[in-house]
Design a protein with these regions (language model features):
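Short catalytic/signature loops enriched in Gly
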Residues: 15-16, 173-177, 269-333
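Conserved ABC transporter NBD signature motif
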Residues: 77-88
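Conserved ABC ATPase signature
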Residues: 181-186, 190
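P-loop NTP-binding/switch modules centered on Walker-like glycine-rich loops
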Residues: 55, 69, 208, 212, ...
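Conserved ABC ATPase "signature" region
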Residues: 88, 142-151, 155-177, 230, ...
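A short, proline-enriched helix->beta-strand linker immediately N-terminal to the Walker B motif
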Residues: 201-205
């Protein structure tokens, strides 16, 4: 992996809030073993905003799902470590992991309409996230609580007030009225705000945002990103943003990781990655971005196609598409 030089010594010396060490997630298929995440490592500091950028199918979303141990069978996390506050999450029991998931590390999923339950009011779905982690008493639509959990229940009135404040904080207008409404009665932007409210309900230290603006128009995209930025500033919540939009990552994030074929190929501050990209793939992504300027410039698409993750070529996975590939690229990653 190409790493940009000159990163802050202070950042490297700080104890990271979240660290991935040689994380590998695989999926057995008829074509062979797909290494969706192929031994990646990164460090996330408290309060930091980190972007993971790459083409569709490169492993960005699987990386986030791996952090929360939400990989469905037959997929499995085959190796590495996921260290959160000095604990390896892969060593936790399923019960211990449930206490981390949604409370300490929460996730905003890509498609709000398929994530929200169409049968329950939005306000009750936000309240349920409090109930699952023992902060609230069960509402009328709550799921059964796992056995052996001790609830720290607040009064029902204060619970609803907390949900209403949260709905207001994420920009859901008239929260008292919207509390009883169902997901189909919300616009796409409001559905995404509801997902963010669910993720923030237990005041997590890390928020994983998987393409949070994909299905939204440009104006609503800007509002959602402004909301996430405000959450980061007001609450100190660390954010990992997954996106295919390099411009968006450059505007929103402090550091950027570029991912290709299950691997991190470049990592650095926004200035390092955007101003002085070292990996040919990063340079190719930047050349694909249309610019509004007086200078007329032809967009240069990256030739070829993303490799089959069940048959990634040896060496640098980008070599078959790279105009500057050398013989060493066929053997060295």
């Amino acid at each position: 992996m190409h790493r940009t030089s000159g990163q802050s010594q202070h950042t490297s010396e700080m104890q990271p809030l979240l660290e991935l060490v040689d994380l590998e997630t695989v999926f057995p298929t008829r074509r062979g073993l797909v290494r969706a995440v192929a031994g990646v490592s990164l460090r996330l500091q408290g309060g930091e905003i980190l972007g993971i950028v790459g083409e569709s199918g490169c492993g960005k979303s699987v990386t986030l799902l791996s952090i929360l141990r939400l990989i469905s069978s037959p997929g499995q996390i085959r190796g590495g470590q996921i260290i959160f506050q000095r604990r390896d999450l892969l060593a936790l029991s399923a019960r211990q992991m449930r206490q981390v998931r949604g409370k300490d590390i929460a996730m905003v999923f890509q498609d709000p309409l398929s994530t929200l339950n169409p049968a329950f009011p939005v306000g009750e779905q936000i309240r349920e996230s409090l109930y699952i982690h023992g902060i609230s008493s069960p509402g009328p639509h709550a799921s059964p609580q796992p056995r052996g959990w001790a609830l720290r229940r607040a009064r029902p009135a204060s619970e609803k007030e907390r949900v209403l404040r949260l709905m207001s904080e994420v920009g859901i207008s008239s929260p008292m009225d919207r509390y009883r409404e169902y997901p189909h009665q919300f616009s796409g932007g409001m559905q995404q705000r509801a997902l963010i409210a669910i993720a923030l309900a237990c005041e997590p230290k890390v928020l994983l945002a998987d393409e949070p603006t994909t299905s939204l128009d440009v104006t609503i995209q800007a509002q959602i990103m402004d909301l996430l930025r405000r959450i980061n500033r007001q609450h100190g919540t660390a954010i990992v943003l997954v996106t295919h939009n390099l411009d968006l990552a450059a505007e929103f994030c402090q550091r950027i990781v570029v991912m290709y074929a299950g691997r991190f190929v470049e990592m650095g501050t926004v200035e390092q990655v955007i101003e002085s990209p070292r990996h040919p793939y990063t340079r190719g992504l930047l050349a694909c971005i249309p610019r509004i300027s007086a200078e007329r410039r032809r967009i240069q698409p990256i030739s070829g196609a993303v490799p089959d993750l069940a048959a990634v070529p040896p060496g640098c996975a980008f070599a078959p598409r790279c105009a500057n590939a050398r013989p060493a690229c066929q053997t060295e990653s």
